[in-house]
Amino acid sequence: MLQEDGLSPNARIANKVGVSEETVRRRVKRMLKDDYLRVVAVPNTEKMGFSSQVLIGLQVIPEKMDIVAEQLSNIPEVRWLSVTTGSFDIFAWVILKDSKDLGVFLRETVFCVEGIQKVETFLNLDLKTRNLDMVM
């Protein structure tokens, strides 16, 4: 239920799952404290004027992997970053205002990071799903 509505009242959850409101409150509090659960707001980036969403694949010099990943993960426009297997060593999902900003971002930010050998961009043309739920 919290995946659908992170602000769902404890009373509604308790009623739906058949336990007391205090039980729900205690369990949610424990899951938050133990980092099993985090309640966040997910912005609609397009409505906020950020129309350019880009997946960036990077090939990196192996001995620079951790440094490059750390540097890129500290850039505000990078929404998620993952070290991977396959043709690319790192994938970064970047959200920008427009394609002009993408060019500036690549030239002034990504290309300046030492250790990156190859960069390939995959511009999002049409987002079909944006599901942050976890299958349980």
Give, region by region, the residue ranges found by the protein language model.
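A compositional/biophysical signature of low hydrophobicity enriched in polar/charged and small residues
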Residues: 1-136
